[in-house]
């Protein structure tokens, strides 16, 4: 599996402390970095799907707007901007269990 490049870092990543999985592909990360900063470093801008099925990007970056909700290690609706990366973490963007389930009548 090809590793995702971090071409959009503000400053080049000097030392990768770990690898996480982003949408099934490995990407390097540094200790103390947030999930959102890793996502944005790869160039991905639309990170979530809201409860209406629309694609949204991170807005505030500080946990207030809830526009960066992703699935982390199987748990839905985690704020990417408030979650620090951990080795082996599995991150899935554009996932929303509300819009992925079929409505029941």
Swiss-Prot record:
The keyword Iron-sulfur applies. [2Fe-2S] cluster binds at residues 60, 65, 68, 81. It is found in: Cell membrane. The keyword Ubl conjugation does not apply. Coiled coil: none annotated. Keywords: 2Fe-2S, Cell membrane, Iron, Iron-sulfur, Membrane, Metal-binding, Oxidoreductase. GO terms for molecular function: 2 iron, 2 sulfur cluster binding; glycine dehydrogenase (cyanide-forming) activity; metal ion binding. PROSITE patterns: 2FE2S_FER_2 (PS51085). This is Hydrogen cyanide synthase subunit HcnA. It comes from Pseudomonas protegens (strain DSM 19095 / LMG 27888 / CFBP 6595 / CHA0).
């Amino acid at each position: 599996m090809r590793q995702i490049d971090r071409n959009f870092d503000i400053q080049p990543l000097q030392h990768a402390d770990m690898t996480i999985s982003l949408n099934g592909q490995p990407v390097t990360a540094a200790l103390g970095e947030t999930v959102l900063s890793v996502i944005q470093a790869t160039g991905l801008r639309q990170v979530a799907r809201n409860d209406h099925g629309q694609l949204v990007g991170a807005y505030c970056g500080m946990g207030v707007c809830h526009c960066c909700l992703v699935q982390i290690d199987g748990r839905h609706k985690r704020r990417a901007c408030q979650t620090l990366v951990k080795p082996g973490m599995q991150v899935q963007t554009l996932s929303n269990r509300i819009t992925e389930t079929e409505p029941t009548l």
